[in-house]
Each structure stands twice: as structure tokens, then as C-alpha cells.
Amino acid sequence: MTAADKHLYDTDLLDVLSQRVMVGDGAMGTQLQAADLTLDDFRGLEGCNEILNETRPDVLETIHRNYFEAGADAVETNTFGCNLSNLGDYDIADRIRDLSQKGTAIARRVADELGSPDRKRYVLGSMGPGTKLPTLGHTEYAVIRDAYTEAALGMLDGGADAILVETCQDLLQLKAAVLGSRRAMTRAGRHIPVFAHVTVETTGTMLLGSEIGAALTAVEPLGVDMIGLNCATGPAEMSEHLRHLSRHARIPVSVMPNAGLPVLGAKGAEYPLLPDELAEALAGFIAEFGLSLVGGCCGTTPAHIREVAAAVANIKRPERQVSYEPSVSSLYTAIPFAQDASVLVIGERTNANGSKGFREAMIAEDYQKCLDIAKDQTRDGAHLLDLCVDYVGRDGVADMKALASRLATSSTLPIMLDSTETAVLQAGLEHLGGRCAINSVNYEDGDGPESRFAKTMALVAEHGAAVVALTIDEEGQARTAQKKVEIAERLINDITGNWGVDESSILIDTLTFTIATGQEESRRDGIETIEAIRELKKRHPDVQTTLGLSNISFGLNPAARQVLNSVFLHECQEAGLDSAIVHASKILPMNRIPEEQRNVALDLVYDRRREDYDPLQELMRLFEGVSAASSKEDRLAELAGLPLFERLAQRIVDGERNGLDADLDEAMTQKPPLQIINEHLLAGMKTVGELFGSGQMQLPFVLQSAEVMKAAVAYLEPHMERSDDDSGKGRIVLATVKGDVHDIGKNLVDIILSNNGYEVVNIGIKQPIATILEVAEDKSADVVGMSGLLVKSTVVMKENLEEMNTRGVAEKFPVLLGGAALTRSYVENDLAEIYQGEVHYARDAFEGLKLMDTIMSAKRGEAPDENSPEAIKAREKEAERKARHQRSKRIAAQRKAAEEPVEVPERSDVAADIEVPAPPFWGSRIVKGLAVADYTGLLDERALFLGQWGLRGQRGGEGPSYEDLVETEGRPRLRYWLDRLSTDGILAHAAVVYGYFPAVSEGNDIVVLTEPKPDAPVRYRFHFPRQQRGRFLCIADFIRSRELAAERGEVDVLPFQLVTMGQPIADFANELFASNAYRDYLEVHGIGVQLTEALAEYWHRRIREELKFSGDRAMAAEDPEAKEDYFKLGYRGARFAFGYGACPDLEDRAKMMALLEPERIGVTLSEELQLHPEQSTDAFVLHHPEAKYFNV
């Protein structure tokens, strides 16, 4: 039912909801269990609560009365199990309508008895999920929809004021219940509101994996009148999901939580939340999220509802600021139509008409291959999948059922159902719980009741789908911009006015035709399409625009098509195109297209002919003879043409594994395996190192080469003779030092050295020097390598070198040191002076390889040529470095001697008397079930692609630029990993613990108080150093002093936060490393690091949103608009972490842990004060406007 039709409702319930907060009832089952019912009461159907509507109406009347008398405005009927599966288990499925009517009539009688003109009482028909999930194939959609129709008819017969579809675990089941209820109302001629409550588990998603955003996107277009949450958890676990609904739902929002998470007690599962605790939580939700209805679920009683009713009686519900985001959704996630810096890409390869591979797989019923094609499009960067099964001679309905049912659970991408047959579209809609798009409608046979337009729109309206509308009318396809816009206007007015669909749910396809025929009438087709898009977006900015893009280039060869498609897409996007049906990986960035090709393609699009110049002929000439094969196929052909041993080395360089085994078999007929490795495979790895060193190869491709090297050696190993000393070129023991859990750098060294002929003994993280030396002695190591990321680790390395001196092993073991906190100067000057043996700094894995080669050459007595240009240059560089170091030391000593004593003030010039914002609560809270899309919006792509993945690009030269790599490698791989990690549930473990604590400053200390009073006792004291020059800053200066707090009667607020991605993402990365999937390992580890940072940034923003100044002005009001400015501290205040810069004392982290208790989200603190899991980070937040990073 559309918003315009809701005046037809036979109740004033929605009016009341709009005026005040309503209170629902609590649990029914809990009360029934306390009623001492006998098996006779159930007529032998033990557990069938619905039969009590007939046998014990008195018990149910009492329960309803108790809730009403406790203050409830509405009660739910005892009809939760009046559905096909529940009653079917008792062989009474034929009584769905009857028992629904009886249960509703009981509640109606009590409501009428206790209601009055001043305060009406309402009845909500409870509609539960049943025990069978249609998305998993347990039951047919149409069967349960019709059963829900029967249940709804009974509720209408009994006098319900609304239907509450609750405890929904499957979006397809929810859709069946809502649409079944609407069908019942049409049959009965009586219309009432429908509310929907989904159940989000402790995992942060619904039972089948649906995020709250996917649920809202799927449910709201069905025409429900209110959406909310119930069951599964207590209020604490619901806050993030309610926040999403509050911000994005255009309809009222409600909640009915359990009385906490159940705990096992003497009487079985017990719910721990007391009535006053539930009331406090729900009152907070109303104030924060603007809820319209609150109540309780499992474990809640009339006592709970009495406290809730009292707590919310006088609360003024705030006006919600809704940010609506037009979207479609899969079962799992929502995809907005508006994409940042991109059109919405609709993958075209799951189309039986457009993809030969997909068609052949569908005809052969090779559904796994069909799913693989769908997943490939996900990897290539598609946002939606266009699913078309129409093919001559096939049963389209059967094919659609087979594929839609599989894609429902196998694809994280929403589906665009593409068919000319309404029966085929309906089959798809009845297997997909997410919000689909329908492709398409037009006026080819008019708009009468029997037209295909009307039949398809009936499906669109009922299922709440988005719809593609083609600019075709009874006269045919529109060719001019004027005609395209004219038909589009007619479509928009018809679809919105007669079918109740939002403009934002309409995708107008202004059609494009090939401009490659040379025919005069087609020359302007590209221009007309572009201008139609521009005019349409000008008139209707909320309407989406789309195109079947590749039509523009039909008739050209594939290479020319790719260029013309890419250029045309760019021009359409500039005109306002929102989406395109296209093969995403076949689109080139404009800067990747050679200038001549780009200009000719633009001339063709805009019909820039001259007497002596035809851009169509010129484009065809440019691509004449150009192979239609992909660049990879060309490269494989080149590879196959090389001599065998050159080919093996080149396979390593290219990272090309296909055909490797056959080449190795052939090679072993000519040379022994060890010779193949040493002479040819290692030559390939040497080339890889040179390419990396010169900036011509990126780290991900280096790791791809290492994977092929590892595979080649593994294939050759069974054919090699084992010797007692199997150390290859040399042996190194690698370890991350004691107290440090970071191992990515160490593992990259492992990969490069082990694939260049060295034996690597990698003993892991947090290794004390005793263990490192024990392994080095046991394994007869040639070299010891130590790694660490933390500043503290540099101190540990120094201590380790001193210990090696003491043990007398310095001359025996040369040492390689690496890590983010180390510098070359520190190692080669300070540490080299301490260590009695060789110690070297390795900036990266390839410098480590070069150092190993040098050390092992010297050990073998292979002295380098002292007079070679390289040796002379190295000596000059070393002499220059030492002279520079000595000069720096001399200058520093002179400056220190010349310094005059400075009087350090007690406090800096930081403003002391600033307004203190009010926190939403005191103490700490935990947050789980975070929507991935919420915090990935603050993921720093540059830090990920450049810093973590090493996509550096070329500045000039022939190689791809950084910007090219971002488009071709970075973003597609990021989308792929986010999709996979989300689908596999790895990102479901992200969690936050944060809190607000009363604080004051005392000199250089921040004191956290036991309560928000200026004279309150000290809970924890944090001491900070003060700058000895400059502004003399100290962290404590940014917190109100105790003296000023006493004078103002108000303390300051100090927020703390700790975020974690959980252990599974680290476990997954380690599995990839162990399985030699080196590139994947690098990428997953990098994503884990940057997602942790993104979550920290996101939660810092949440804290700024929650801290309120006078006039209810949030601290976040000063936030920047551009994402990049977040990474430059463009907001008010800053967050600081112990162990760095201005707060170097890592011991203070233990106090923060005591305040936050992060064990509740699975984070612990090691003896070395490191957080576990590794992908966790903590901070305290300063709200002071002058608070920015500084060093002491």
C-alpha cells in the first residue's frame, strides 16, 4: 500500500504513533510458562500455545490485562505460531485462520474493555517466522505466502489494529508474510497497517547473514508502516542496528528487545535484565534514535513494561534526521544506486542472450559454472548482476527458479531480473529475499490493463522492486533526445502516479544504438543519448539513468569496441549517467587510452566529420589487424614462443603458473632439478628483484612471482637427491622480537629469501633472544634476522645485540634488522658501534636479499672486486654517510652547548576555559554487529594501496602510474576482498568498546575521577611529559583543571575507545601465508590493518557525534565534508594512543584496559602491553579545539 493509500486504514494507530511514543507488551511465552498449564490444556499438543486460544482464553485474557494495566498501549495476540510449519507439526495446519481469529478476538475484548476515548488500547496481530526458511529451500514462497494470507484473514476477522510480522530471520519469509497480509486485506476489504520486526543475532546479522541495511532496503519498499528489531539479544546489542534504522528509515522505528542475553541458571536459561535496566535502556533509545514504539520480548514481564511505561511517559521524542539512500539489496548487503566516483556497474555476463559461456552452462545445467561467472563479475567490480535466462526453446520459469534460488545465497550482489516474460520475472522475485530491480518496462504494446507494461508493473509494485524503464512507446524506439525525454516523462508520471513507485526507484534507459554502421541516420545516436541523459537529470535529479552501454559499438572489432565503450561511458557519466549494464573489466580509464584513439572515438561519438576526415573510418583503420585476443592471451602466445629455459625464467617474472608443470617435465629431460632451480628459476627471481628495485614491478606482482617459484620448487623437489646439508645458498633464522606481534615485514623477507634459494627458519612473533639463539645454534644458521614494528622493539633489538655480545656469539652470527620504527642511521651508526659482529639495516625484503648475498659470498671466500664501479660507488656512499653522521653529531653538540637554560612554565598557552561537551552516558559500552559499509567509507585507500600493498606506479616511463594501478588492481581487488571477507563472516567479528569518563587535570597529569564531581576521588592518574621548548605543550593542558572544574561546578570529559577486527582475519591471513598464497596474504593483512584504522576513525566520529555542546550542537558539526580531510585531522580535537609522541608511557595502556574492560569483545593485553588480536587499536580522545598531534 502506498503512502497515498494509507488514509484508507481502518484504525487511527498510525496517527497515535506520530504523536507520541507507544508502549507495547512483553513476552507471551514467559507468562504462559508461569500459568501452570496442563497437557489437557494443550489437548495433548504439548507446546502448541495457539491451541490455548480455544482451550484457555481466560489465561490469555489475564496476560493481556496484566500488560495493559502495567501501562502497555498495545498487546500482541497469541498467534505467533499460527503458520504453516508450526501448526503443520501438530497436524492442524487447516486451522490457521480459525486460531488466528480466536487469539485476536481475545486480545480485542480486553483492549475494548480497558480502553477509553481518551486512551485507546490496540491489538497487534503477531505473525511469527515458522520453522522453515524459503531462501534455503525448506519451503516454497507461494505456499507460505498463502498460509500467511489465511493467518492475516483470521486477524482481520478478530479485530486486529495492525499486523506485526516479527522475529524475522529470512528476508524472503518476511516478504511472504507482508505480501500475504496485503492480499488478505484486499480479500477482506479492510486495510490495517503492517509492521515488521527483524531479528539480528549476536553475530551482527540476521540468521542467514543479512545486514540491517539489507533488511531495511528490502522491507521498506514493501509498504510496511514501521520497521524495528525484536528478540535474539538485549538492548545493548541492538544499538548499532537501531542507529542505522533511525538514520535511514523513512518510516517509524520500533524495538522490543529480550531482557538481556540469556544465562544458564538453576532453572535453565534465565534473562538477567531487571525492569529498571530495561526501562533505562529503552528511554535512552527513544532519546537517541527517536523510536515510535518500545516493548519487550523474551524474558520481559508486566513488571518490565510497568517500568518502561513510567520511564517513557514524558519523554519528548526527537525529530529524526533521515538520510535516505536509494538502494537495491542482496540477501546479505545493500548497494546504493549512487556510487562514489563511479557509475553503478551492472554486470552483463549472467545473461543467456549476451554471454555464450553463461548460456552454454545454463543449457547444460552446470549451475556451478553459472555461479562462477557471477562471482567473476563481482571480482571484476560489478555492483549488480543482470540475470537473463530467456532463450528460445527453454523453460524460462524453470531456469529462473534454478538460478535465482542459487544466486540468492551464493552472490553478495543484488540481482536485476531481465526478461520479457512476467512469469519468469515472478519466479525470480519469489526466490530472492533482497530488493531486486526489474529489467524492464516500456510502452511497446501500450499501457492498458493487458499490456506487458501493466503486468510487469503489478509485480514491481507488489514486490517493492526498482524498475528499468525504456524510452519506447507505441511508435517504437526513441532516437532523438527530445523524444527520449518525452517518453521518459510519461513513464515517470505513470510509474509514480499510478503504481506508487518512488522516482528514485526508476532507472530510465534512454537507449543507445550503434554508431558503427556508417549509415547517416545513426551518426547522431550517441549525441542524442548523451543529451537525453543530461536533460532528464536536469528535470528529475532523483530518477536514476542507465544504459545497455555496449550497443554503441556493435559491429566493430573487440579492441575498438573496448575503446569506444570506455569513451562513451565517460561522456555519459559526465552528462549524469548513474548506471550501466557493462562488463566492468572491459572498461578502460580515460588516461589508459592512447590519445589518438581517445580523440578519434570522441570525434565518432560527437559526429565531428570533415570533408577529408571520417572518425568511423579512422577508428577502424587504427584497429585494423589488432588482435581481438586479450592482452593476457597475447602474452601467453609470446611466452610459448620462447626457448624452454628462457620460458621458465620468464614464467617466474610474469607470475604465470599455467603450463609450468609441463615445462618442468620437459626441462628435467635435459638438466637435473637443482641445476634448473639455480640457473633458470633463480635467474627469474633475480630479474624480479631488479624490476622491483627500479620501480618497474609492484609488490603484489613480486609475491605472485614468488608463488610460482614456490610451486616450481615444490614440483621439482621429489626428483631431487637429498643431502645432509640442505640449506641451499645459506640459512637464516627470522623472528619478530619479544613483545612485538607484528609479522608482515618478517614474512615478506621469508617469502623473498626462501624463493631465492635460501633456507629460512621463521620462528614467529614475540621471540626472546634466548629462543632466537637456541634455534640459530640448533639449525647452524648463517645469519640472524630480527624484525619489529613498535618503537619499543628498537630498544629490544639493542638489548638483544648486547646479549649476543655477552654470550660471545657476535662474530658467529651476522645480524639483519628491519622494521617500521628503525632507521638506517640508528642501525649503521648507533647499533653498529655496540655490536661486536656485523649488523645491517634492511629497508625491505629485497635489500635483505642483497645483504644475504653479500654476507654469504664473503663466507664462501668470494671476495668482491674492490675496483669495480659498484664497489667504488659503495665505498664513496659509505664514507659520505659517516661524514654526514659525524657532522650531524657535531652540530647537535654545538647547539646543546649554546642553549641557554629555559624556564619551563607550569602550563602552556592552550585555552583553559572552553565549553565542555556533555557525554550521552558515563562509563563504558560495547558495540557489536557493525555494518561493514558504515566504516569502510573511512578506509584510507592511499594508505592501503600505496603503504600496505605497495602499488607505487611509475612517474613517467612506460609502466602504469599509481592512478592506473588503483583503477586496474587496487579498487577491484579491494571490492573482491571486502565481498569475500563479508560473505565468509570474517568481518562479522569487528567490535568496539568505548566510554566517557569524568576527568580533570592536575599539573602534567590527567586524573580520571570516580564520578562526575570536581571533588570526587581519583580512579586513575595518567602522567604526561611536557615540551621543554616551543609552546611547552602537555596533553594535560587540554583537559579542564581541577581548580577550574571546582569553580565552574563541572568536570571535563575524557572518552576512551578500543576497536578490533577480531582474530579471524589474522587467522585467515596466516592460512594464506602457510598455503603459499603470498599476494593474497599481503592483501588480506593490509586490509585488516586499514579496516582497523577505518573503524577507529569511524568510532572517533561517533564520539564527536555523541558529544553535545549547548544548543544540542554536536562536536561533529565541525567535521569536514571530504573523506581525505579526516586523514589530515580536519575535525575538532584528536585521538591519542599510548606509546607514541606526546604520551609515550605504554604502561598507561593497562589503566585504559581497566576502564574499558575489552575482554568483553575478545581483546586482551599481553605482558608486553600489546593488544591481542593484532588488528586492534586503542586511543583516548581530546575534544579541545587546539588538540593536535605534537612531540615532546
Swiss-Prot record:
The lineage of its organism: Bacteria, Bacillati, Actinomycetota, Actinomycetes, Mycobacteriales. This is Methionine synthase. Residues 343-601 form the Pterin-binding domain. Zn(2+) binds at residues 231, 297-298. Pathway: Amino-acid biosynthesis; L-methionine biosynthesis via de novo pathway; L-methionine from L-homocysteine (MetH route): step 1/1. Keywords: Amino-acid biosynthesis, Cobalamin, Cobalt, Metal-binding, Methionine biosynthesis, Methyltransferase, Repeat, S-adenosyl-L-methionine, Transferase, Zinc. GO terms for cellular component: cytosol; peptidoglycan-based cell wall; plasma membrane. It catalyses: (6S)-5-methyl-5,6,7,8-tetrahydrofolate + L-homocysteine = (6S)-5,6,7,8-tetrahydrofolate + L-methionine. S-adenosyl-L-methionine binds at residues 940, 1135, 1189-1190. The keyword Metal-binding applies. It holds the Pfam family B12-binding. Residues 893-1192 form the AdoMet activation domain. The keyword Zinc applies.
